[in-house]
Amino acid sequence: DCCPIAGCPFGCTICC
């Protein structure tokens, strides 16, 4: 699952 990264200007995601 990939979750949004708070504070990323382009709404990037990280797989957690």
From Swiss-Prot:
Organ and tissue specificity: Expressed by the venom duct.
Cysteines joined through disulfide linkages: 2-16, 3-12, 8-15
Lineage: superkingdom: Eukaryota
Keyword line: Disulfide bond, Secreted, Toxin
Molecular function GO labels: toxin activity
Keyword check for Chloroplast: no
Subcellular location: Secreted
One cellular component term from this protein's GO annotations in UniProt: extracellular region
Keyword Secreted: yes
Family that this chain belongs to: Belongs to the conotoxin M superfamily.
Comment on protein domains: The cysteine framework is III (CC-C-C-CC).
Name recorded for this polypeptide: Conotoxin ar3f
Species annotation: Conus araneosus
